[in-house]
From Swiss-Prot:
SMART domains: AAA (SM00382). Its main location: membrane. It comes from Frankia casuarinae (strain DSM 45818 / CECT 9043 / HFP020203 / CcI3). This is Phosphonates import ATP-binding protein PhnC. ATP binds at G36, L37, S38, G39, S40, G41, K42, S43. InterPro entries: AAA+_ATPase (IPR003593), ABC_transporter-like_ATP-bd (IPR003439), ABC_transporter-like_CS (IPR017871), ABC_transpr_PhnC (IPR012693), MetN_ABC_transporter-like (IPR050086), P-loop_NTPase (IPR027417). It is a peripheral membrane protein. Residues 4-247 form the ABC transporter domain.
Length: 253
């Protein structure tokens, strides 16, 4: 069973066509990068996977669930199995790094409230393990706002892992980072995906990063899929030509 399947997904916002009959699948454990310019539909498509957006036509199947038909407890259970890492880190500056990571457990454990003192020891230890994995265990008790941008995004990745997801969605996770930090964060996501058989669907606009870290690249332009290929079968020039250059839309597989 595919981890995610898009079947003719179309999305309109008023008169604006954001997605135009998008169809492709993401297999379990696969790292797929959505590549395209701002406004190409990448973020909109990601938000269909956990039901933040609903399709105007077509459907999305995630972890065996028809997302558009999921309601109540069924939708909550689906979202528990999916984590999201955003371009903006969304850390709580006044909390410690460890406390921020612990908040990732709020969605799966009942009776927890924001604040370190309410977290069971097992939750704190798990959070420390994730911080160790992202190389920030020594900063666990610092305030989150004392970290660099790259470090804060690594905290966001650790927080996402606290949810114990089966799918990780990442929306331009390195857009605000310098090249070195970008490579570190993408490398970390790639390594964790391999270790945990974690399915990753990530949006980027940097071609070289996508080619370096993805199993497969799906290119979007004007809401349409114009490219769907294994990253190893593409070079920089091909990707740029298909995704970023003007001209008639023509999908290649």
């Amino acid at each position: 069973m595919s981890a995610v399947r898009f079947e003719g997904v179309t999305k309109r916002f008023g008169q604006t066509l954001a997605l135009d009959e998008v169809s492709f699948t993401v297999e379990p454990g696969e790292v797929v990068v959505l590549l395209g310019l701002s406004g190409s539909g990448k973020s909109t498509l990601l938000r269909h996977v956990d039901g933040l957006h609903g399709a105007s036509a077509g459907r999305v199947i995630a972890l065996g669930t028809d997302v558009g038909q999921a309601r109540g407890a069924r939708l909550r259970e689906l979202r528990r199995r999916i984590s999201f890492v955003f371009q903006q880190f969304h850390l709580v500056d006044s909390l410690s790094v460890l406390e921020n990571v612990c908040t990732g457990a709020l969605g799966r454990l009942r009776g927890l409230r924001l604040g370190l003192v309410t977290y069971p020891r097992a939750v704190r230890l798990e959070a420390l393990e994730h911080l160790e994995r992202v190389g920030l265990a020594s900063q666990a008790f610092q305030r989150a706002d004392t970290l660099s941008g790259g470090q804060q995004q690594r905290v966001a990745v650790a927080r996402a892992l606290m949810q114990r997801p089966e799918i990780l969605l990442a929306d331009e996770p390195v857009a605000s980072l310098d090249p070195e930090s970008s490579a570190q964060v993408m490398g970390l996501i790639r390594e964790i995906a391999s270790e945990r058989n974690l399915t990753v669907l990530c949006s980027l606009h940097q071609v070289e990063l996508a080619l370096s870290w993805a199993d497969r690249i799906v290119g979007l332009r004007s809401g349409q899929v114009v490219l769907d290929k294994a990253a190893g079968d593409l070079d920089h020039q091909q990707a740029v030509a298909m995704i970023y250059r003007a001209g008639p839309l023509r999908a290649i597989a």
